[in-house]
Amino acid sequence: MQRKHLLIASAVLAAALIAAGCASVPSPAELDAQAVTMIKSSFRDQGIAKLARLEQDLGQAACSGDKPPADDVAKRVEAEALASIRWPAGGQYLGDWREGERLAQNGRGMTWSDASAAPAGNGAQCYNCHQIDQKEISFGTIGPSLWNYGKLRGVKDVADPASAAIVQYTWGKLWNSKAYAACSNMPRFGHAKLLDEQQLRHLMALLLDPKSPVNQ
């Protein structure tokens, strides 16, 4: 009888401990807060790299969870991103494709060791994620191939009204990629002031100019 009482007492104690353990498990919100605190404590301001970079806007926060954002949130992210696009002055979309290729090859910029965060010191590092010119054998595959980008889309003259939609889409994608895909992995070159208007024109020329090797 005494043994039976001991077993019952042990079972009750075990159940109580389990219940207490379950009750002490942090909520998802608490875990998120702990993670943010840990991340912030692991970094410091260094040169041009500031802790402010850890602050997320709506689009970043919405796409950092374990599930895709709800449709209404994704639509809001895209709408706000589309509204943020600044179209090129004078409707001038194209620059020099040669400069665009240099930017596409250049992965420099925005590190703590860089003297300035100004766009002039930044590259676009397009080849990290895309194939562009087939002569380049080193490229990433996170993004789609951009080989023959303009040619495949029938762009023969960027001033032709028939090409307006793809020209404007391409500019918008470079300026703020979240305008067309809420959780796009592509850098928001214009929105984040990573590149200036003229640099974006050069990238546009690389992709759309019929004379660019990309479209041969």
Give residue spans per PLM region.
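Bacterial N-terminal signal peptides that target proteins for export
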Residues: 2-10
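Residue-level detector of alpha-helix boundaries and kinks
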Residues: 7, 84-86, 188
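Core hydrophobic alpha-helical transmembrane segments of single-pass membrane proteins
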Residues: 11-17
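Post-cleavage N-terminal segment of exported redox proteins
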Residues: 17-110, 173, 206-216
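Extracytoplasmic electron-transfer domains, predominantly the class I c-type cytochrome c fold
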Residues: 30, 34, 38-44, 95-99, ...
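Secretory-pathway/luminal and periplasmic proteins that interact with or process carbohydrate-rich
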Residues: 110-113, 135-139, 213-214
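Local sequence-structure signature of Cys/Sec-based thiol-disulfide redox active-site neighborhoods
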Residues: 113-124
